[in-house]
Regions:
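Glycoside hydrolase catalytic-domain context in secreted enzymes
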Residues: 20-734, 740-754, 761, 765
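Gram-negative bacterial Sec-dependent N-terminal signal peptides
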Residues: 1-19
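Short glycine/proline-enriched turn or capping motifs at secondary-structure junctions
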Residues: 3, 755-758
Length: 765
């Protein structure tokens, strides 16, 4: 792959603007050398220069490039985000080198969440792969392309555990499970940062949003979070720590309050936990405008007080507001903020710049000027093969009645739906520098797959939504939803006519990407009514109906599950989404994705997640009882459980075999199963291992994921899959907030999803 190739570009500092002779050189990238270097640099800096390093400025209408260059010249800026071309980045770094007193380099950051120019599946889709090699591919390609654009840092990965699909930002994360999110977040950090964020094609990561942003009440964006310390540390904190233990150089602090205190002013969170308990040495960055928002939170009385509270609480860099530059000089002069506190924040910023290699070469991610691409969006800069490979693994087959799929590449195929030919929507939210015109739609992918062997007829069929208020909301800043001026009846009639002349109907339905984004919380997680009407009309034709879902959250699909012959969950699959979806629809690739979030039957079930507590009156479907934990108007469990996903073949999992009946605290026990492909074609599935602490000092979840492995088998082939279990897999935060495992019986569940499992057991001595 080209992103693995060594380019061998050595940038001579002699070719760049004049540098401070004692600042730049071949500095060893070690903590000891860094600390000594930064200590000496701090001695040379004025108060204003120190404060300038704490400012993270966004390029945009409020801060045009020309105005920012003046700030840079005066040493008022430490870093820039939302500039994504080498040419623009080079000009800004030139300003530092040419005009600023100390020539301390800027770093440049962007939201590279699931790709930079090549857009991969959204993170929720990537989690569906249950494949860490796929995560590594996304991380390395994303870092390569970001660094090739001159960027030094990404605001990723997002590791907020979310169990509420009403929340729009769940699309950015890895789902409901702590273990899966931790594992994927850790892998993404390692892939993006490589051996060092100073490497030419690596970038520094910023784990976000610290902390528990995915648990906002009611799934409502920016809302409050309130939970016990046991739940916080058991379920929500581990993914952040996993990313930091993997070496992430930065943490983005959440916008929400946690147990009554905004994260931006929470010294317990940012100092006691992050710095003292976890030993984090990197930078903390406020989220967009969060310091200003402390006033509305009610924990600061005015702008000056907000700055004082934020800095003293542990916020190093201020994102996209002018408060630090306006109010810190006076606070330092008055002694309300000490010089030691200012130096500490500045030191953290200088440390990460050192770790990025910027004091060795401020242009390290830019290369020589004559190497800048003539066309920033050139096709040659994309990594389409990798995008297609990963996208195929992210797709989840939810239903396949009477083997409706795979389709034949013959006859007539109707492709309908408002998302079938949407280049923008297939990329999903937070698509970085991706260009919509370079993405492949489902319609294009199907046409390419069948060539001249089949006839494809297309009809839009419906708008994403006919609710004018929702359209206005979604289109407030960009045209996220395009509205067809035809009447709903005209559009449905066209789709029905297309269906009647076809052998099978593929309806591409769900959400516009803007509906699963920041500030896109929903109270109704069904498919919009305009599309439900379309589906009903298509069902009435009697033709086989395949639903291809595009969405950034679990949807309530009870009616659609009854109507459709097959359902394929594709999330937002990225640049090569259309081709990947066609690969699965026609059987060129056997689907193997699994759900990283449970799909509720209705919004009233939320939160519904697999690792719940048993309660004192658990519901037993085999022996229903009124006085148990249940709903009387809806089934208890989800429509599709966590870890669920079908294949075009079938698998049999044997009984669980334990290597020993007991486990010593310093030992291991192994749980094994034999997995057989009992179908007629090669396929892959994800074998999942869950653990349950049967009796403990606190009520424990009915099961918790503690291992998974994707296995590919030929027809009739059998493989043994083994999972080692040690005491760390059994630990939890008890009532005294001690992290420990308690002796006693443990159940082990292994299967192809969280519901279909076989059981083993052992005892911890």
């Amino acid at each position: 792959m080209k992103w693995l190739c060594s380019v061998g570009v050595a940038v001579s500092l002699a070719l760049q603007p004049a540098l401070a002779e004692d600042l730049f050189g071949n500095h060893p990238l070690t903590p000891e050398a860094r600390d000594a270097f930064v200590t000496e640099l701090l001695k040379k800096m004025t108060v204003d220069e120190k404060i300038g390093q704490l400012r993270l400025i966004s390029v945009g209408p409020d801060n045009p490039k020309e105005a920012i260059r003046e700030m840079i010249k005066d040493g008022q800026v430490g870093a820039i985000f939302n500039t994504v071309t080498r040419q623009d980045i080079r000009k800004m770094q030139d300003q530092v080198m040419d005009l600023s007193r100390l020539k301390i380099p800027l770093f440049f950051a962007y939201d590279v969440v699931h790709g930079q120019r090549t857009v991969f599946p959204i993170s929720l889709g990537l989690a569906s792969s249950f494949n860490l090699d796929a995560v590594k591919t996304v991380g390395r390609v994303s870092a390569y392309e970001a660094a090739d654009d001159g960027l030094n840092m990404t605001w990723a990965p997002m590791v907020d555990v979310s169990r509420d699909p009403r929340w729009g930002r769940g699309s950015e994360g890895f789902g409901e499970d702590t273990y899966l999110t931790s594992t994927m977040g850790k892998t993404m950090v390692e892939a993006m940062q490589g051996k060092s964020p100073a490497d030419r094609y690596s970038v520094m990561t910023s784990v976000k949003h610290f902390a528990a942003y995915g648990a906002v009440e009611g799934g409502k964006e920016y809302n409050t979070v309130d939970m016990s310390p046991q739940r916080l540390f058991s379920d929500y904190m581990p993914p952040y720590k996993a990313g930091l233990d993997a070496g992430s150089g930065a943490v983005m602090v959440a916008l929400n309050s946690l147990n009554g205190t905004p994260a931006t002013s929470d010294s317990w969170l940012l100092k006691d936990v992050l710095r003292d308990q976890w030993g984090f040495k990197g930078i903390t960055v406020s989220d967009h405008g969060a310091i200003k928002e402390l006033i509305k939170h009610g924990t600061a009385s005015d702008p000056e007080d907000a700055v004082r509270v934020a800095l003293k609480s542990g916020i190093n860099m201020s994102m996209s507001d002018e408060y630090y530059s306006k109010y810190l000089p006076g606070l330092v002069k008055s002694g309300k903020v000490t010089m030691a506190e200012l130096d500490d924040a500045t030191r953290h910023v200088l440390n990460v710049k050192y770790d990025m290699g910027l004091f060795n070469d401020p242009y390290s991610h830019l290369g020589p000027k004559d190497s800048d691409p003539a066309d920033t969006n050139a096709e040659s800069r994309l990594h389409r093969k990798e995008a297609r490979d990963v996208a195929r693994e992210s797709l989840v087959l939810l239903k396949n009645r009477l083997d409706t799929l795979p389709l034949k590449k013959s006859g007539t195929i109707a492709v309908v739906g408002p998302l079938a030919d949407s280049k923008r929507d297939v990329m999903g939210s937070w698509s970085a520098a991706g260009v919509a015109d370079q993405s492949v739609t489902v319609l294009t992918g199907i046409k390419s797959a069948v060539g001249e062997n089949a006839k494809v007829v297309y009809a839009k069929g419906a708008n994403v939504t006919n609710d004018k208020d929702i359209v206005t909301f979604l289109n407030q800043y960009e045209e996220a939803v395009k509205v067809d001026p035809r009447t709903p009846k005209e559009m449905i009639d066209e789709a029905v006519n297309a269906a009647k002349q076809s052998d099978v109907v593929v309806a591409v339905v769900g959400e516009a990407q803007g509906m699963a984004h920041e500030a896109s919380s929903r109270t109704d997680i069904t498919i919009p009514q305009s599309q439900r009407d379309l589906i009903a009309a298509l069902k009435a034709t009697g033709k086989p109906l395949v639903l291809v879902l595009m969405n950034g959250r679990p949807l309530a699909l009870v009616k659609e599950d009854q109507q459709a012959d097959a359902i394929l969950e594709t999330w937002f699959a990225g640049t090569e989404g259309g081709n990947a979806i066609a690969d699965v629809l026609f059987g060129d690739y056997n689907p193997s994705g699994k759900l990283p979030m449970s799909f509720p039957r209705s919004v009233g079930q939320i939160p519904v997640y697999y690792s719940h507590l048993n309660t004192g009156r658990p519901y037993n479907a085999d022996k229903p009882n009124k006085y148990t934990s249940r709903y009387f108007d809806e089934a208890n469990g989800p429509l599709y459980p966590f870890g669920y996903g079908l294949s075009y073949t079938t698998f049999k999992v044997s009984d669980v075999k334990m290597s020993a009946p007991t486990l010593k605290r310093d030992g291991k026990v192994t749980a094994s199963v034999e997995v057989t492909n009992t179908g007629k074609r090669e396929g892959a599935t994800v074998i999942q291992m869950y653990v349950q602490d049967v009796t403990a000092s606190m009520s424990r979840p009915v099961k918790q994921l503690r291992g998974f492995e994707k296995v590919t088998l030929k027809p009739g082939e059998t493989k043994t899959i083994s999972f080692p279990i040690d005491v760390d897999a059994l630990k939890f935060w008890n009532q005294q907030m001690k992290y420990d495992a308690e002796p006693g019986k443990f159940n082990v569940f292994i299967g192809v999803d969280s519901a279909r499992v076989n059981k083993g057991e052992f005892e911890l001595l």
